[in-house]
Amino acid sequence: MTDNTWAPLCVYCSPINGDLLVGMMYESTSDSLNEGKIIRYNSTGQLTQTIQYDNTGRGLYRNVDYITENNNGDIVACDSDWKTGYAAVVVTERGGRHRFFYTGPPSGPRLRPHGICTDAFSHILVCDDRTHAVQMITKDGEFLRNLLIRPPGLLEPWSLSYDRNAHLLWVASWSGKTVSTYRYINRHLDFEG
């Protein structure tokens, strides 16, 4: 990567094909908004894709802070702009076509996303800095439930990873300075109560 105008903010290595996804930001020096994009490199280091705009030419991202790939190939990113208060989960299909924005549950406060991952059911799990919980949404952007609502030792969930073999959710806590594991799916791929 040799472009000096764009700064890499996050990286993700796809277990599907070994591609490297990089979340990028161009910080505007004027009063205009920051711009973001996701670029994809194949296993030989060749740039193969840039995802930046929706089908109307509107920018999809401002600051791509966290990125993951769902089982169906969708690219899932936490996007935010703390200057303006904008924050959302942005999902595109593998080819780059915009699918949806998720900004929080219908009856709750707006999401302030941080860490993000997906599980064996293709659910999207995202840390919410506003509620200090991990939100679970469907692969189509519908809110399912909150996980880990202020459990002991987890003061501010900040980063996530899902272990697909052991079905464990790894959660890093910013304020608690801990990394913890949680099981919410049993080994038979059912939800635990």
Label each PLM-derived region with a short phrase:
Residues 1-193:
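Eukaryotic scaffold repeat domains enriched in small/polar residues
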